[in-house]
Regions:
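Sec-dependent N-terminal signal peptides of Gram-positive bacterial secreted proteins and lipoproteins
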Residues: 2-22
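N-terminal pre-catalytic segment of deacetylase/amide-hydrolase enzymes
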Residues: 17-97, 244, 253, 257-260, ...
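Extracellular/periplasmic catalytic domains that process cell-envelope and extracellular macromolecules
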Residues: 29-34, 90-93, 117-120, 154-157, ...
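Metal-dependent polysaccharide deacetylase catalytic core of the NodB/CE4 family, i.e.
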Residues: 43-46, 95-97, 117-225, 254-255
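Substrate-binding cleft of extracellular glycoside hydrolase catalytic domains
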Residues: 81, 100-105, 118-121
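Membrane-embedded segments
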Residues: 94-96, 100, 108-112
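Acidic, His- and aromatic-enriched active-site or binding-groove loops in soluble protein domains
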Residues: 237-247
Length: 282
């Protein structure tokens, strides 16, 4: 049994209220740890729009951050790259960083992707599959999402991977995140069956369009519990980005992340250099 699987089982045992218990940050392997896992969502060229939400970053600021990573010799890893390290197939590179994006907004293609290409950096995008406009023939006013064609172009570059952010569980149900919310009168087996069905539907569509299954499941709102994790593992997912603030340690497939928005570049530098040891995602 792979060491990473034993690690995830231990993490599940420590789950309390859908949030994994804190882990000690490892300081091993020639100073390659802690590993910053940067989390982005939407990108904009409009200052007022960017200031209105912590989930939006100005394109110019994103470029400044990516330029720093390239100039300072960071190695960008995708979720699949990280999994290869966990499986012992690849060594951990010097100065690793994961650039991760959630939801699948079209700004990932129009703003973030050109920057990634310019600096030769890799990123992983977790998509809410039901929000892809090709699915239902409509898009979201104000915050359009990427089409399959746009995503396939990005994936074909070798710089971007696409992963699962559920099919249609990025919403609220009875005041709770849908991924963990039980419907009225729903038992645990029925709940797990429903969650598995959603994850399988998203996974099938992603595999159909990219000719490979998504290995990562990014939990909407960072919410998960033991039943959700079991369903995720049962459906073939092996890397689990969360919303909990912190650094990855290179040993666990459950990844804390750090939300990045329009922070000063000096603060960004402190984060990616591993010098910011306490924080909280909004």
């Amino acid at each position: 049994m792979p060491a990473w699987f034993l690690s995830i089982m231990l993490t599940i045992m420590l789950v309390t209220g859908g949030v994994a218990a804190p882990r000690q940050v490892s300081e091993q392997a020639a100073g390659t740890y802690p590993i910053p896992v940067l989390m982005y969502h939407h990108f904009s060229q409009n200052v007022d729009e960017a200031l209105a939400s912590r989930m939006i970053i100005l394109g110019d600021n994103f470029e400044e951050q990516m330029r720093f990573l390239r100039e300072q010799g960071f190695t960008s890893l995708t979720y699949n790259d990280y999994l290869a390290v966990l499986d012992g197939e690849e060594p951990m590179p010097a100065r690793p960083v994961l650039i991760t994006i959630d939801d699948g907004y079209e700004s990932n293609y129009t703003i973030a992707y050109p920057v990634l290409k310019k600096y030769g950096l890799k990123a992983s995008i977790a998509v809410v599959v039901s929000s892809i406009p090709d699915i239902y023939g409509k898009n979201f006013p104000g915050y359009p999402h990427m089409s399959w064609a746009q995503m396939q172009e990005m994936e074909g570059s070798g710089l971007v991977e696409f992963h699962n952010h559920t099919f249609n569980l990025h919403r609220d149900v009875n005041g709770k995140p849908a991924l963990v919310a039980r419907l009225d009168g729903e038992g645990e087996e029925a709940f797990k069956y429903r969650v598995r069905g959603d994850l399988i539907q998203a996974r099938r569509l992603l595999e159909e369009h990219f000719q490979k299954p998504p290995n990562a499941l990014s939990f909407p709102y960072g919410a998960w519990d033991q039943a959700v994790m079991e369903a995720a593992i049962d459906t073939g997912h092996r890397v689990f980005p969360t919303y909990r603030w912190g650094y990855a340690d290179g040993n666990s497939p459950v990844l804390p992340r750090i939300l990045i928005d329009d922070i000063p570049i000096a603060e960004f530098v402190q984060i990616v250099e591993g010098k910011t040891r306490q924080g909280k995602n909004p």
